[in-house]
Amino acid sequence: VHTLYPLYSWFFYELGIKTFLSTEVAHEGVARAEAQYCFPAEIAHGAIQDCLDKGADYVLMPHFRDMPSYEDKVHANFCPITQALPYYMEKAFPDIEAKRWLPLVVSFKFGEGKALELFCEMTSLLGIGEAETRTAFNKAWAKQKAYFEAVEKMGIQALADARKEKRPVIAVLGRPYNAFTPEANMGIPRKFTTRGYSIIPFDILPFRDEVIFPNMYWYYGQQDLKAANLLKNEDNIYLTFITNFSCAPDSFILHYIKWMMGQKPFLVLELDSHSADAGVDTRVEAFLDIIDGYRTKKNEIDAERYDNGYRFVSERVGDSDEFNMYINNVKTKEKIPVKDNKRVKILLSNMGNISTQYIGAVIRSLGYNAQAMPVATNKTIQIARANTSGKECVPSQLVLGSALEFFFSDEYRKDELYLLFVPITTGPCRTGQYYVYYENLFRDLRLENVVIFILSADNSYTELGPSFAKQMWIGVALSDYLKDIQCSLLATAEDPVQAEKVFEHSWRHVMNAVEHKPKGLWKELKIAASEIKKIPLKRSVNSCPRVLIVGEIYVRRDDFAVNELIELMSARGIVVKVAGVGEWIHYLDFVREYALKKLVRLQKPGKRLFSKPSRDLKKLQIEEWWKHHIEKKILSILNPTGLIPETPHDMRHIMKYTVEHFVNLELNSEIAVSSGSAAAAMDAGYSGIVNISPFACLIGRVIEGLFTPWARERNYPILSVEIDGNLLPPNIVNKLNIFMVNVLRFKGGQDVSTLVDKAGE
């Protein structure tokens, strides 16, 4: 609302609709929050309550999806908590008629014309025609652009004035909703001005052409980093960054600002609903003292950051689907091939032992030297935390910790080159920031022979060409089903320990075939299925209650993160199904198809059929058919074991649940697919849902805020668990025991007496 207020206010004014802003944070509204959101989201609950208390006929809660990007190769979206605001607010205020919420998706990714369509969808609910909406939108957007131009002129003047000031000038960074509003910023700008220091808000500065770290896909992240880069060499301007406890984007953005600023001091103020005014005063005064000390030494030259000179390069070969991969040494100009080169080793972080070992075997079979990292341990997380701020999410710490554990071990050799594989995304989650963070952290650690090796989720990780992509998909689908079997055996086998040994022996043989005899995979898989089928069972999968684990993809698939939950539930006879990696890939394909269909509609009618988006769409649909074919082939071999729980997998079916009950399709994240798959599973006979996520994960908390009230209305058992890399604390174990009792009762005919006894052990 702060960034686009000219657009909103003029738009409704032109339509003859009176508008007003909230002025209070009503505590009754804050208390309605269904999850532990960040401070600004808590305030939003109270602000909406204030609007309702003041008699608003309608409340505008935009799904603020994206803005025009400052960067050429990456879009500019917003964090999941910001984007999902209208969806979890509707769940938090179930007593408010749905028609009082004005659903508006704000998206400029595909231009103003597409943005107008979304405004028309909203006004149609108010009985306002398209022509009137178009006129109002065009006038309002012109006012918005005029506002942007005016404030940039103010920024240019403010920058010029700051250079002439005798006293230091403070630039306030953050986000408009937490840095510039009195409800959220605890009067921090005033604390500087009352001491005689001038303030410049970050979003008026002329930073458009500033160079920042790659893949910065958050709109306000782009603005903050560009502002920081603009000001790092300004002798008289110093940064104060206002952030909030558990702010996921800032857990990485603050690292980037630290690397940008070098030795120049800047202040970070982390606020929440418990922050004390006196503590903020103390930090402001200390910062001003530090500035005075720094200014006396500002002519000292910062040391140049270390750079090992190695860059990973992946180049498409002509118009084909093949890629040429090599490591470029920018210092010596040497191009070091990755394929068929024992000197280069690809390191695969463990995200589920079966899938990681499979991908490692596939990569080796293609002529690359690859090593799958072992399952993480407590030591892994400790090593990571010794080299981080601790605010990063657990998956980033596990990937980093496994790499550093290897680099600090006897296996590490200086005569080798290591490619650390890090998959990336383009938001809105933090995953896409991992590789940027690792690259710069490794520079700080002065690692001489380590390079980051990236693939992108936007292409369903197919950059290495069709051969690898096909083998990877077989591995993903197979690993998902093998994980199902492994979990089912824990709950149903007469001797789970012996069953695990038989199972591991079987899948290891499959992995050996993948690496050394790829054509023998299906034969070896049939042998494995036959051996697994012989394992004695004390109960069938169908007779057991089933629980689906959804949530953030890394922790739900990482054995170190999720196994304690699985083992505790399996010991009570509950079959656990962990939502697969394949589900995520199908969702990525669904999102690609959805985006391509939008692009096709933007083409001129006579050219749509043969346009590039149309051709890409047909190609994608063929890929999807093939992926489903592989899944059916694997299932036909493994299903006779009787150990694969039946689960809804059709993505279109899942997304129907998502749209009907949770979020708009424009919200592209794990939120959409996990909420929909959980709801579909419960309606398909599951007895409970566990939503697992890293501590303070944006995705996990929004899923909790959406799914918990939906499940509560239907008396469905639901448990949300946040993983911090340690054993589950007693309070979570107690909640898990209560959840398991509810699961057994929901299934019906289950004896819960043993569970009650064990809960007291």
Indicate where each model-derived feature is located.
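An N-terminal assembly and electron-transfer interface module characteristic of large anaerobic redox
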Residues: V1-E761
